[in-house]
Regions:
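Polar interaction faces of repeat-based domains
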Residues: 206-217
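A short glycine/serine-rich beta->alpha loop
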Residues: 10-15, 48-56
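Conserved phosphate/anionic-ligand binding catalytic regions in large, soluble enzymes, centered on
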Residues: 54-75, 191-201
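Short glycine/threonine-rich beta-strand-turn micro-motifs
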Residues: 216-227
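Mobile "lid/hinge" segments at catalytic clefts and subdomain interfaces of large enzymes
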Residues: 69-171
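Glycine-rich, flexible beta-strand/loop modules in the N-terminal catalytic cores of phosphate-handling
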Residues: 1-42, 128-136, 140-145
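Long, charged amphipathic helices and adjacent flexible linkers at domain junctions
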Residues: 157-184, 229-231
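Glycine- and acidic-rich phosphate- and metal-coordinating loops
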Residues: 1, 27, 37-52, 173-176, ...
Length: 231
């Protein structure tokens, strides 16, 4: 989230509190749809670079991140989308809310002058992450309920567009993506795979460029790590 994305002049080279907070919310929202490690034993680094911002870049990062993961071949259970709602209120003489308007997909000015920034992420089945920032003393239940209903309807529309663009994850990883494969062999054949003094396993590594890791529990599970599909 560089300063120029919001028209500011600032320093580069360190992570800001805004980037940490937005990143944590986006990560928490995407985690529930990631596959278990046994099915997809890869380390995943998801980067969202903001070039221009006028509100809710964390929600854009969730939507863009979900599309990017699907396009990369990560088998997400389903898409995740996020959107924010705002609130503008008018108080009576006693300090109670007399009038209010709930705003969907707020921009920077509506966030600055408004009374609420309610970010909510989820799939078609439920919520995966949310964050509520308020400038008023409290949020009445009826307004909170209306805001959730409004943001849920908006999320479904976003998911419709995302599903039309990328309905499912790619069946295979990109050609040049690192590969991890698990092969089950007869435990009695482990010695033959290793060879005298590790001769066989070293030869395989030299020829293919792949690394081979054999589980220590004598289960016969062999993991092959390669830099790309050809290896």
């Amino acid at each position: 989230f560089p300063p120029f994305s919001v028209g500011e002049a600032g320093r580069f080279g360190f992570t800001s509190r805004r980037e940490i907070g937005h990143g944590a919310l986006a990560e928490r929202s995407v985690l529930p749809v990631l596959p278990p490690e046994d099915d997809f034993p890869y380390a995943i680094r998801l980067v969202s670079e903001v070039m221009s911002s006028n509100g809710s870049t964390s929600m854009a990062s969730v939507c863009g991140g979900s599309l990017a993961l699907m396009d990369a071949g990560v088998p997400l259970s389903q898409h995740v989308a996020g959107i924010s709602t705002g609130l503008v209120t008018e108080m009576d003489d006693d300090g109670n809310i007399a009038k209010y308007v709930i705003l969907t997909d707020i921009i920077g000015a509506e966030d600055h002058f408004g009374d609420m920034d309610f970010k909510l992420c989820g799939t078609r089945d439920g919520v995966t992450g949310f964050q509520l920032d308020l400038k008023i003393r409290g949020l009445p239940f009826n307004i909170a309920k209306e805001a959730v209903k409004q943001v849920t309807e908006a999320r479904m529309k976003i998911l419709d567009v995302m599903d039309a663009c990328q309905p499912a994850h790619r069946k295979e990883l990109r050609e040049h993506a690192p590969r991890i494969e698990m092969v089950q062999i007869d435990p009695e054949k482990i010695g033959a795979l290793i060879g005298p003094g590790g001769k066989n396993i070293r030869r395989i590594t030299e020829v293919t460029g792949a690394n081979i890791d054999i589980d220590d529990d004598n289960s016969g599970k062999v993991r092959v790590y390669a830099k790309d599909r050809d290896a």
